[in-house]
Amino acid sequence: MIETDKLAAERIIAATPVSPNEEAFERALRPRQLEEYVGQEKVRGQLEIFIEAAKRRSESLDHVLLFGPPGLGKTTLAHIIAREMGVNLRQTSGPVLERAGDLAALLTNLEANDVLFIDEIHRLSPVVEEILYPALEDYQIDIMIGEGPAARSVKLDLQPFTLVGATTRAGMLTNPLRDRFGIVARLEFYNAEQLARIVTRSASLLHAQIHPDGAFEIAKRARGTPRIANRLLRRVRDFAEVKADGNITAQVADAALKMLDVDAVGFDLMDRKLLEAILHKFDGGPVGVDNLAAAIGEERDTIEDVLEPYLIQQGFLQRTPRGRVATLLTYRHFGLAAPDSSSSTLPGLWDSAAT
């Protein structure tokens, strides 16, 4: 699976960062305040109230859990929370915190009301998670000093702080950890209008000339994800400078994205490979995810975390108790005739009894 994993990481429409350079690029375009943050109106409105209330009381903000598909702005929101609160932000990730001492070192160096951001928090080890519980509730941690019979537990007081946890797999969080977050927010996919605003803002920061229709052409192929929209903008900007006069119009954007093999709904080769496997190898489904993973040479987690969310959200794929099923939209997208109602396995399209 090494080559396949590499291909997944290099997808132009991958929702995860593909290189350190892209991470630096993202930081340069990242909004710095809530008022600059586009989309997620409900979450943004809630955070505005909670942050203002905490500041008026001179308290730390309640612990915040942000979850949703990758690339929607969880890290950006963590930075904005710290900046709006006027405090420092310390950033780490679940897999990095291998030992209890790793977390203890971070916690004991936090100043009053600081923000600790843990990405991929669902990947914390049980040992580290146990240390985190009293820190979240009582701002205290227990550490062991010494070894063997002489070892003893010492309780250390911590400064009040805010934990911001981010995850793409909220269902993998343990109940005790989830219950310790006072603020829980799900980030949703963006619509094309919101993404067009993000593309326009990013183009301005990059000093690129873009027409509204060009921004919308990029936005509608960005799979509802700001990270993808900004990545496509960079590639379209390159195309516009070399193959056009530098202006990003709808025609220029369309030509650039066709060159990149990104179709009108944001599908790339891997998306089409998955959907075509369901259509042609499994007669439209249902097919179990393990069989599907074997058929296209992908990891199960990649299908569930990277490929499926957008396809399901856009109505091209359905999860059923019996497996994955192609929808009528999928047949139409590939120019195929859908099964008739007497033989169809498509749920919910003709037969209300299907599940």
From Swiss-Prot:
Annotated region (Small ATPAse domain (RuvB-S)), positions in chain: 191-261
Main location: cytoplasm
Domain of life according to the entry: Bacteria
The species this protein was found in: Paraburkholderia xenovorans (strain LB400)
InterPro entries (alphabetical): AAA+_ATPase, AAA_lid_4, DNA_helicase_Holl-junc_RuvB, P-loop_NTPase, RuvB-like_N, RuvB_C, WH-like_DNA-bd_sf, WH_DNA-bd_sf
Function text: The RuvA-RuvB-RuvC complex processes Holliday junction (HJ) DNA during genetic recombination and DNA repair, while the RuvA-RuvB complex plays an important role in the rescue of blocked DNA replication forks via replication fork reversal (RFR). RuvA specifically binds to HJ cruciform DNA, conferring on it an open structure. The RuvB hexamer acts as an ATP-dependent pump, pulling dsDNA into and through the RuvAB complex. RuvB forms 2 homohexamers on either side of HJ DNA bound by 1 or 2 RuvA tetramers; 4 subunits per hexamer contact DNA at a time.
Domain notes: Has 3 domains, the large (RuvB-L) and small ATPase (RuvB-S) domains and the C-terminal head (RuvB-H) domain. The head domain binds DNA, while the ATPase domains jointly bind ATP, ADP or are empty depending on the state of the subunit in the translocation cycle. During a single DNA translocation step the structure of each domain remains the same, but their relative positions change.
Stretches for region Head domain (RuvB-H): 264-355
UniProt subunit comment: Homohexamer. Forms an RuvA(8)-RuvB(12)-Holliday junction (HJ) complex. HJ DNA is sandwiched between 2 RuvA tetramers; dsDNA enters through RuvA and exits via RuvB. An RuvB hexamer assembles on each DNA strand where it exits the tetramer. Each RuvB hexamer is contacted by two RuvA subunits (via domain III) on 2 adjacent RuvB subunits; this complex drives branch migration. In the full resolvosome a probable DNA-RuvA(4)-RuvB(12)-RuvC(2) complex forms which resolves the HJ.
UniProt name for this protein: Holliday junction branch migration complex subunit RuvB
Encoding gene (name): ruvB
Segments for region (Large ATPase domain (RuvB-L)): 4-190
Binding site for DNA: R300, R319, R324
Catalytic activity, as annotated: ATP + H2O = ADP + phosphate + H(+)
EC number: 3.6.4.-
Signal peptide range in chain numbering: none
Cross-referenced Pfam families: AAA_lid_4, RuvB_C, RuvB_N
Residues reported to bind Mg(2+): T75
Cellular component, GO, one term: Holliday junction resolvase complex
CDD domains hit by this protein: AAA
Membership in a protein family: Belongs to the RuvB family.
GO terms (BP aspect): DNA recombination; DNA repair
Sorted UniProt keywords: ATP-binding, Cytoplasm, DNA damage, DNA recombination, DNA repair, DNA-binding, Hydrolase, Nucleotide-binding
Keyword Hydrolase: yes
